[in-house]
Curated annotation (Swiss-Prot):
Classification of source organism: Eukaryota, Metazoa, Chordata, Craniata, Vertebrata
Family label: Belongs to the protein lines family.
Modified residues (Phosphoserine): 635
Disease implicated: Intellectual developmental disorder, autosomal recessive 27: A disorder characterized by significantly below average general intellectual functioning associated with impairments in adaptive behavior and manifested during the developmental period.
Phosphoprotein among keywords: yes
GO BP field: cognition
Organism in which the protein naturally occurs: Homo sapiens (Human)
Keywords: Disease variant, Intellectual disability, Phosphoprotein
Protein's name according to its UniProt entry: Protein Lines homolog 1
One Pfam assignment: LINES_C
Keyword Phosphoprotein: yes
Expressing tissues: Expressed in adult testis, prostate, prostate, spleen, thymus, skeletal muscle, fetal kidney and brain.
InterPro entries xrefs: Lines_C, LINES_N, Protein_Lines
Length: 757
């Protein structure tokens, strides 16, 4: 026993270091072959299994003269503690797991890797270790079961990588238990192992992932559909063992997410990868089951990931493969899922969705009678459900041919969504702009907020194109403006609320633009293109924001910012922006601001009347910038086609950059779009003065309130300057030249607007 444990410990240390083995590969099989009886899969109580389950006859234990190996301390039990068969098995499984991992690693030395490969092949072929591991992961000992499942998953992936015939015993085990799900308690073991293998495929850096996955899924394509139908056809309320269904459903969602991710990223089209899109109503019905809230939450989040094509990101330890170009088959499936979601919403799905989360308590799950229980909505479900509906609408409307049908459906579903959200958003949206729902629902999750804003903008643009194709530019304009506000998807309002949420801070926009996520870049580009065409409407909405907030005594950013007046200048900032004649008459069209006062926004406040706003024009975040923009020297104007040196451009960045190049490069005067930071008469000297953030009162006791239009223009100017300076230092991750052209054009039309005032 002592010698046996010493050999295992020494072998573990060698494999951990990736060192070569001194003995023949067959000599190690005796020590690595688990003590499991083939008859009853029970764990042996001693090491007497060597003559029955081990390799008999020829390969006897190695004569060990153990030499110490210098390694980092490892948590190995002493020989006396390892006397039990359980501890021996755990160490055996650990060695097998580490050895297999070493084989799959590119860092392992070639000779050592070949030795490890021989050992594992012998274990699989002669010792039938895969069959024993199948028995072991059904063990009541949870640790032993988990280790056995991990080892089995790695060994199966090893077989796939080495193009060895996949374990017949495991294939038979999975097919039997998945097809007999209702009678079997072992389906969860199959699901867990399948999930672990696909994770290994994603995690591996080899170039044959698609071929490996294709070989793997071939064995389970048919049986997986049978299991899917069986799982969702049962009536949950009539089941006795609900915990079994919950466990299997949670594990199944992880597996299904990886299958869909592999379908999107690796371009395979097995039925098991498409089953959700072929039968989406089955999954949606889970939300109506009398099941725990966390299960419904997982289902809704799963649907959100599918519609956003972000499946698999949280489950794969390694990086998910780069998103492939659009696939017609995937687009068709996404449309089927979107239609199913909207059909369920139309049938009253949101009315059955409870969003109040159950509170957890230390020491129990019930609140004491003397304690007050305050319930609050589950904002995770609110966000996920809202985004699922918005994305489904965007996908569905992309395939519509009639603008009138889009209008009718949009009004119906947005009414359903706003009615669903209304009880959970206080104060009520009716007091303010209905478009505010998006910023309030997603205030704690900026990535979901950007996805929702992008989807909303996509819906607006789709509907706009449809209306322009069937109506004149002026026909029905008033009704159109009213429709966008009433149904909460006006793109200008949504963008203004977004800027308010971030305090008009250009550094936040810069962070989003240089992020590895491209959602904001795509959204921002599309919005700037819209802004060029719809400037008058945007300007009017800015005025309406100021008027509405003045009526309800709501500051733009929660408190009134102070402007330090430049004593050397007699210029003052207009307190109210008067729209040019081309868009003055639009003000009254917006029902949410129709009763707003028309008086100018004026505020001259005494000392100490208001605290200083932390999100004023010169944001505190700007002083904490990663790059000292003011230290950058100006350089020559760069050409539109110039790429940044030493910068890595992803395919998505390139695609978005090309889009803005096409949009911004149309008939613009080259001199007008000079990329050098220009002198800007629009922002007056007082406006450009730095603010105080320690709640001090401005000199001369003058505190002025500035309209939202000025804040937006200032934010865009700061963003443009920051991008220019980063570009000159080759610090921007992609070529921003076309983006700068869009920002420059916005500045030009801003100046023209100011000149008309």
């Amino acid at each position: 026993m002592k010698v046996f444990c010493e050999v295992l410990e020494e072998l573990y240390k060698k494999v951990l270091l990736g060192a070569t083995l001194e003995n023949d590969s067959h000599d190690y099989i005796f020590y690595l072959n688990p003590a499991v009886s083939d008859q009853d899969c029970s764990t042996a109580t001693s090491l007497e299994w060597a003559n029955t389950c081990g390799i008999q006859g020829r390969h006897q234990p190695i004569s060990v003269g153990v030499a110490p190996i210098a390694v980092a301390p490892v948590c190995l039990k002493t020989n006396s503690q390892m006397s039990g068969s359980r501890e021996v098995m755990l160490l055996q499984l650990t060695v097998i797991k580490v050895m297999t991992t070493r084989i799959l690693s590119v860092k392992t030395e070639f000779h050592a890797k070949e030795q490890y490969r021989d050992v594992i092949k012998i274990l699989l072929e002669s010792a039938k270790v895969d069959s024993k591991l199948i028995c072991m992961f059904q063990n009541s000992d949870k640790l032993l079961s988990h280790m056995a499942a991990q080892c089995l998953a790695l060994l199966l992936y090893f077989q796939l990588r080495e193009k060895i015939t996949l374990s017949n015993s495991w294939i038979a085990f999975c097919q039997k238990n998945l097809s007999e799900y209702s009678e079997s308690n072992k389906a969860i073991y199959c699901l867990w192992t399948l999930t672990a293998i696909i994770k290994e495929i994603f995690k591996d850096s080899c170039s044959q992932k698609t071929e490996i996955l294709k070989q793997f899924l071939t064995h389970f394509d048919t049986i997986f559909e049978v299991f899917y139908n069986s799982l969702f056809s049962q009536h949950f309320e009539n089941c006795r063992d609900t915990s079994k269904i919950v466990n299997i459903l949670m594990c199944f969602l992880d597996l299904l997410e990886l299958l869909i991710a592999s379908r999107i990223h690796l371009k395979l089209h097995f039925t098991c990868q498409r089953i959700l899109f072929l039968k989406p109503s089955c999954m949606l019905e889970v939300i109506t089951w009398p099941i725990q809230a966390f299960v419904k939450r997982k289902v809704i989040i799963f649907l959100k990931k599918c519609l956003l094509c972000k499946v698999g990101e949280d489950l794969c330890r390694g990086s998910v493969p780069a998103l492939m170009p659009p696939d017609h088959h995937v687009a068709v499936d996404m449309l089927a899922l979107a239609n199913a979601v909207l059909q369920a919403v139309n049938s009253g799905l949101l009315k059955t969705l409870s969003v109040y989360e159950k509170h957890s308590f230390f020491g129990g799950d019930e609140v004491q009678p003397e304690c007050e229980l305050i319930t609050s909505p589950d904002h995770v479900i609110l966000r996920a459900a809202s985004l699922v509906i918005m994305k489904s609408l965007e996908i569905k409307f992309q395939n519509y041919s009639s603008a009138s049908e889009v209008k009718v459906d949009l009004q119906r579903f947005m009414s359903e969504l706003l009615t669903f959200l209304k009880p959970h958003l206080q104060p009520s949206l009716q007091l303010h702009n209905p478009c505010k729902w998006l910023s309030r629902v997603f205030i704690e999750q900026d990535d979901d907020m950007l996805e929702a804003a992008k989807a909303s903008l996509g819906i607006y643009l789709t509907l706009t194109r449809g209306c322009e194709a069937t109506e004149s530019l002026t026909q029905g304009k008033e009704m159109w403006d009213h429709h966008t506000h009433e149904n909460g998807y006006n793109p200008h309002c949504i963008f203004l609320f977004f800027l308010k949420n971030i305090g008009f801070d250009s550094t936040v926009l810069l962070d989003f633009l240089i992020s590895s996520e491209t959602c904001f870049l795509e959204y921002f580009v599309r919005y700037l293109k819209l802004l060029q065409k719809d400037w008058d409407n945007f300007f009017t909405i800015c005025n309406n924001f100021d008027a509405t907030e003045s009526k309800y005594d709501i500051s733009i950013c929660g408190c009134v910012p102070s402007l330090v007046q430049d004593q050397s200048s007699n210029q003052t900032i207009p307190h109210r922006l008067t729209a040019p004649h081309s868009h003055r008459d639009v003000c009254a069209r917006h029902s949410w601001a129709s009763d707003a006062p028309s008086e100018p926004l004026k505020a001259v406040m005494s000392k100490g009347a208001h605290t200083m706003c932390a999100s004023s024009l010169s944001s505190p975040r700007a002083s904490q910038s990663l790059v000292d923009y003011d230290s950058s020297d100006d350089s020559d104007v760069e050409s539109t086609e110039q790429c940044l040196a030493n910068s890595k451009q992803t395919s998505l960045h390139q695609q978005a950059t090309k889009e803005i190049q096409d949009a911004a490069g149309t008939s613009r005067d080259k001199k007008e779009f000079s990329l050098e930071p220009p002198s800007r008469p629009l922002v007056l000297k007082e406006f450009d003065t730095a603010f105080s953030f320690d709640c001090e009162v401005a000199p001369n006791d003058v505190v002025s309130e500035v309209g939202i239009f000025y804040r937006i223009v200032k934010c865009f100017q700061e963003l443009q300057d920051a991008i220019c300076r980063l570009q000159k230092k080759n610090l921007f991750p992609y070529n921003p030249t076309a983006l700068l052209k869009l920002l420059k054009y916005i500045e030009v039309i801003s100046n023209k607007t100011m000149n008309t005032l």
